[in-house]
Amino acid sequence: MLIIFIDADGCPVKDEIYKVAERYQLKVFVVANKYINIPANERVEMVVASSGFDAADDWIVEQAGPGDIVVTADILLAERCVKRQVRALGPKGVEFTEDSIGSAVATRELMQNLRHMGEMRGGPAPMDKKDRSRFLGKLDEIIQSLKRR
């Protein structure tokens, strides 16, 4: 059964995921280190992971399996998921695959080093309507491909 896991701390597309999951009648686990308000829906479940480092990520990796979807902006979590044949999707609609995850990890490390050296400040650009639209389209595409299996 296809399940969507949300790495929920700071995820900007939770509402969009809830709507898509409702349309397809899918189970959603909202995973975070602290309680987050979720819709009153029997298919949406809040999981508060322990407060340990990467506890939410670890829970997601342990629970998600092939045929599931993880929505995360955390590239290292996406890498762990891809290695387990779990579909990983970023909140801006970029799917992490076996072919793309290596360069995503390398880019993350480069940006982290540049920030550490003071060469760069700030983070990614804020979400806009195009990002949300791209995310919804890609999520729908992934769900359709998994349902055809």
Swiss-Prot record:
It comes from Bdellovibrio bacteriovorus (strain ATCC 15356 / DSM 50701 / NCIMB 9529 / HD100). CDD domains: PIN_YqxD-like (cd18720). InterPro entries: UPF0178 (IPR003791). PANTHER family: UPF0178 PROTEIN YAII. Belongs to the UPF0178 family. This is UPF0178 protein Bd1212. Pfam families: DUF188.
